[in-house]
Amino acid sequence: QVYLAAEIIVATKTHKMHAAWVRAKPEHLAAAELFMDADMAILATPQPRLSEYDAQISREWGQTPGLESFEFCSGRFNALRGFKTAGPVFMTTEFQELDSAAQANIDHLMDFWQHRLTVLNRELVTVAKTASP
């Protein structure tokens, strides 16, 4: 059971179970999908909580919210884009009603991080111009 829990927790990084694990443990797939959907449910929360969650992610990665590095902003945007292009956020019927809210929030977060990248890019260009002779 500990192995099962560990595998499911690791899967939350990509929100996909490894095919070999699914073949070996098909009877646990429903539990794994439910766990991963519960992990993603934060994306369907109201904006204030969503912003708080996003700031927590920045801190988890050693960033100061509002002062994130270009690399972090780019990575965060790309992670969100990955969720967006993967299709529905939720795999289980228990969570599917939250999908439209989660998709809208992903769009909101992508807009936020795209804006941060634009601002940082302008700052980098300004610094580069002032540094050149």
Where are these regions (language model features)?
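Acidic/histidine metal-binding catalytic segments
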Residues: 1-11
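Divalent metal-dependent phosphate-bond-processing catalytic cores, especially two-metal-ion Mg2+/Mn2+ enzymes
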Residues: 14-133
